[in-house]
Amino acid sequence: MVIKSYAKINLSLNVSKRLNNGLHDIQSLFCLINLFDEITIKKQKRAFQKDKVYFSGQFAKDIKSSDNSIQKVLNILRKKKLISNYYSIKVKKKIPVFAGLGGGSSNGYAILNHFFKKEINDKTINTIAKHVGSDLRLFFYKKGFLNNINRAIKLKNQDKLYFLIVFPRVKCKTASIYSEVKKYSPKKNIFEKEII
C-alpha cells in the first residue's frame, strides 16, 4: 500500500510571536495541493528493535534518516504506548525540501493518520504538533484558516485554485525563517473576518 503525503501552500502567513515551547503562534490561510511524496510502511521482524526510515528521490539527500518528523511521530506514539512494533518506512520524495511546502510535516501526519485515522481529533493533533511542529495541524484540517495555536476555521469558499510551483533550489529552513520573528513586531493580528 502506498500512502500519498501531500504538500501545502500558505496563501497567507502571519507569524505573531514565539511560544514558550519554542514553536511559533501563526495565522495562516492554507490549502493542500496535488504534489505528494509516496510512503510505504512495513512492520519490522521481532528481532529488530529500531525503526528504519529511508528517503529516496531527487529531494532526499538533505534529510536525516534519524531526525525527521516521521521518526518524531513514531517516538511519541511509542512513548505513549500507542504502538509497540517497529517499522521500516520508505519515502519517495517528490516535494522539495526547505521550500515552505510542508513536506516533512506532511510525512509525519501521514504516518499518524495511517495508524489512527478514526481517532485523531483537535486535542490529539495539537498535543503531537507541540513536539513535531505547528504545520502538522495543517494536514489534519486540510484547508482553511488556522488562527492561533489551537483553532482552525474551514473556508466558506471551496473554489478550486490553480498554481504554478517554481522551485529555485534556494534552501530556506523553516526554523531559520521563523527565528527572524524576534527582530520585528507584527503590526497587528489578522482577524478571521478580514480573510474568510
Give a label for each model feature.
Residues 5-9, 35, 140-142, 159-162:
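A generic structural signal for well-ordered coil/turn residues at beta-strand boundaries
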Residues 14, 42, 116, 139-141, ...:
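Short beta-strand-to-turn element immediately C-terminal to the catalytic PLP-Schiff-base lysine
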Residues 39, 77, 108-119, 155, ...:
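Alpha-helix C-terminal capping segments
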Residues 1-99, 117-119, 123, 167-170:
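ATP-binding N-lobe of GHMP and related small-molecule kinases
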Residues 121-132, 194:
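Short, well-structured alpha-helical segments that form the helix of a local strand-helix-strand
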Residues 99-125, 138:
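DPxDG-like acidic metal-binding loop motif
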Residues 49-55, 68, 141-196:
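Conserved, helical-rich catalytic subdomain that frames metal- and/or nucleotide-binding sites
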